[in-house]
Design a protein with these regions (language model features):
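Structural transition elements
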Residues: 249, 368-402, 420-423
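Ligand-site clamp/hinge motif
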Residues: 150, 237, 266-311, 417, ...
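Long beta-strand-rich cores associated with HINT superfamily self-processing modules
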Residues: 70, 542-568
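Gly/Pro-rich hinge or "lid" segments in bacterial periplasmic/extracellular proteins
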Residues: 122-124, 213, 220-273, 277, ...
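Surface-exposed binding/hinge segments that line
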Residues: 148, 183-230, 253
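Extracytoplasmic/peripheral linker and loop segments enriched in polar/acidic and small residues
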Residues: 439-450, 477-546, 568
């Protein structure tokens, strides 16, 4: 490959110091083409610009490279077929559909049918994609981010979208407790307050952060699944009756615990949908969804786990879209309650788990082992030199004895009924028993499990709790919400000023190499402390019949049907 230095010099003109730094890192080989796309788009370099720079460096632009491996794909050859209804199986939402409070897969699948974000984090693309924001850029230290908005956008109720709507939306999402109740506080806590959101002009919004943050665009993207833009003054408690948003579809009907229908939004700013309508049917668990696909009662399963899905995973009758993902499970241990006040006990639990065995048995290989910290293969900043923790029963027993538990102990783990999690709970119980740890299981449905806050919550207050975490394009939420002293989801009650300081340093870093250095420190620190066990990373899976084309899922359970269609 030959580098075109003249073209590269031309493309450098007018670029910021940070943008030129990333170009330097690419040219020197310190930054891979894949990581250049991800980090370049994060700081606001457009997809066409990134592609042109890659082309000038030699080879293809790579700007459309998929971040997934797919058996079956989201696209197909031939002209799209217009018309018809696409039938989708989805997990039942655990509560009323409310973007301000949503925290479950079924709810967020519903929200993105009519709602849109400033930025789209597509698992099928490496670079962040403009949605309601056309462009974004940071100041020199990443403490202020400026977003240029798409103009001519109309909500599906006929009302124009303005900068005032964007400002109001993020002020609601970032309102701190106790007045604020947004689930987005897991993202915005310590990062953004309502006072930091400002309208600059009719098409520009500025975010002044509480501290510099190099990954902030992910915080206002589809990763922050409740952050759809709504009209100023929206009553979120009544959103389920309108599904007001700027997306390609608008609400046809919604029946709690049964399903929903959507029809094209005639005022949509983008390409119009091919479908006449979409129909979602809700299911309380995965087995009936698989049976519905096999019985031709639905065309698509929005998201599923590989456990118990061999009949569709191994059949040529179905298309399977497989996405690289940071979906994972977290086993929190209360660091303020005996015996988990001693990090040796927490480490002992971690050493009992057979991670490769769990990936093989529960994920059918559609995932990878994790290492007891929230940095995984999806993230460019992960320090891959840190050794992988493996099952070592002898080591676990040694740690327990040193901590004063030579005969083990008995405790209770709370968990939820969702995908493979009940089976994972059984695996953890069986593995821990090999070291003398007796774990009693308390497994409930998601409505009960997530229905309360600190003080009366099965997942936030249990001595041990096993919980699902959806995909994020950057690890910041995983680093802060469940682990920092003021984290909104700190079920482990992990309060450590050294860790809090490291997370602040990581968040503030704009440079990828600096992020990697700090990530390595965090990884090693968490391996020593082990407030949370991370068994594995899970690939995102969506299934459809062979007649379905144009699906655009994310591994956080969103399903975009803007360009979906059914071939004859």
């Amino acid at each position: 490959m030959t580098r075109n230095n003249g073209e590269l010099d031309r493309l450098r003109e007018g670029r910021t110091e940070l943008e030129n730094h990333y170009i330097d890192e690419l040219v020197s080989g310190n930054l891979s083409r894949r990581d250049f796309l991800r980090r370049g788009s994060t700081i606001g370099m457009s997809v066409p610009l990134l592609g042109a720079i890659l082309a000038a460096c030699g080879g293809s632009s790579g700007s459309s490279s998929s971040a997934s491996s797919a058996s079956g794909t989201s696209t197909s050859a031939g002209a799209p077929t217009k018309g018809g209804t696409l039938r989708v199986a989805s997990v039942t939402p655990s509560a009323a559909i409310n973007p301000l409070l949503v925290a479950d897969a079924g709810g967020l699948t519903m929200i993105n049918q009519t709602g849109e974000f400033l930025i789209f984090d597509s698992n099928l693309k490496l670079a962040l994609q403009p949605m309601l924001a056309l462009s974004w850029s940071p100041n020199s230290d990443g403490s202020v981010w400026t977003f240029k908005l798409r103009t001519g956008v109309t909500f599906n109720n006929g009302q124009p979208m303005t900068a005032d709507d964007v400002v109001w939306t993020f002020q609601q999402l970032s309102e701190p407790a106790p007045k604020g109740t947004s689930s987005a506080l897991s993202t915005f806590g310590g990062v953004l307050t309502p006072a930091g959101v400002k309208k600059v002009d009719a098409s520009t919004v500025e975010f002044t952060l509480e501290a510099p943050n190099g990954n902030f665009p992910y915080f206002v993207s589809s990763d922050n699944y409740g952050a759809i833009i709504v009209p100023k003054g929206t009553d979120y408690s009544k959103w389920q009756s309108t599904f007001v948003g700027t997306g390609a579809f608008k609400l046809g009907s919604y029946t709690p615990n049964v399903g929903a229908t959507f029809v094209p939004n005639p005022n949509y700013w983008g390409a119009k949908p091919y479908l006449d309508s979409t129909s979602f049917k809700f299911y309380s668990s995965q087995p009936p969804m698989i049976l519905a696909l096999q019985g031709n009662d639905v065309d698509v399963i929005a998201q599923f786990a590989p456990a118990g899905a061999a009949a569709i995973l191994n059949s040529p009758t179905y298309k399977i879209i497989k996405l690289e993902s940071a979906n994972h499970r977290e086993l929190s241990m209360r660091t303020d309650l005996a015996p988990f006040t001693d990090p040796r006990v927490r480490q002992a639990v971690a050493y009992t788990i057979d991670r490769p065995g769990a990936v093989a048995a529960l994920l059918s290989g559609d995932g990878s082992v994790a290492n007891d910290y929230p940095f995984g293969p999806r993230y460019p900043s992960t320090d891959t030199s840190v050794p992988q923790r493996t099952q070592d029963i002898a080591k676990a027993k040694q740690l327990l004895a040193a901590a004063g538990h030579p005969n083990g102990f008995t405790t209770t783990m709370n968990s939820e009924i969702y995908q493979e999690i009940p089976q994972l709970a059984q695996v953890i119980k069986a593995d821990a028993a090999k070291a003398g740890i007796n774990i009693n299981l308390s497994i409930t449905n998601q409505t009960i499990y997530y229905g309360k806050t600190f003080g009366s919550s099965p997942w936030l207050d249990g001595t041990m709790s096993l919980v699902d975490y959806g995909d994020r394009g950057a690890p910041n939420v995983y680093l802060s919400a469940p682990l920092t002293t003021k984290g909104t989801w700190n079920a482990a009650r992990f309060h450590n000023p050294t860790y809090d300081s490291l997370v602040k340093q990581y968040a503030a870093a704009l440079d990828l190499q600096a992020q990697k250095t700090i990530a390595g420190k965090i990884e090693n620190f968490l391996l020593q402390e082990t407030p949370i066990v991370y068994p594995y990373w899970i690939d995102g899976l969506t299934a459809s019949t062979q007649q379905v084309n144009g699906l655009n899922p994310t591994s956080i359970a969103q399903l975009y049907l803007n360009q979906a269609y059914k071939s004859a």
